Amino acid sequence: MPRETFDRELRALQDEVLVLGSMVEQALTESVDSLKRRDRTAARRLIAGDRLVNEKRFAIEAAALMLIATQQPMAGDLRTLAAVLEIAGELERMGDYAKGIARINLLIGDEPLLKPLLDLPLMAERARNMLRRALEAFVRRDVALARAIPTEDDVVDALYNQVYRELLTLIMADPRRIEQANYLLWVAHNLERTADRVSNICERVIFTVTGELTEIAPDHGGLGGIA
């Protein structure tokens, strides 16, 4: 394959990563918005649509592996393809978190919300903004931006802790609220884990540009979200 053709296919593959990122960002937005609106039709649509996210991830992986197998890329190109594989996986998992939030919407059903979602919409906004900027860093090969973004995870963590405290207070006041409080805590957890996975993407950006393997993502004990 001529170098020009390889470069064109590599750029197209990176564009597909951005498409997948946009799909996931939209899913995160809709998952929280539909919960806020109590729109279970939208939640079901989101759950069904997660199949498209999975298919996009698998298509990206297949194309990346084909380039690796047939072109035997070296150095920077190989790191870029490795990053594409990793980032596609991280994005697909974020899509699972959005699907999990939609499922929680269905589990809550017609029950009135304990409180207007506390800081959950703000958590979602922060996580989406981090994701958007991480993908920008990937496209621009911006190491400084990739190193800066994970520091914003502290804000998401603080919001998670605030949600936890508020839900605990509500449970203590009325133990009958424990089931929905637990559901909302899982929403917060899924959003917090989304921000963590953005940090993983930033690690891959740094590796792509510098060849440096560095751990900048926080460790929260490996709890899984509802997905």
What is the meaning of each model-derived region?
Residues 1-227:
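Cytosolic, long alpha-helical scaffolding segments
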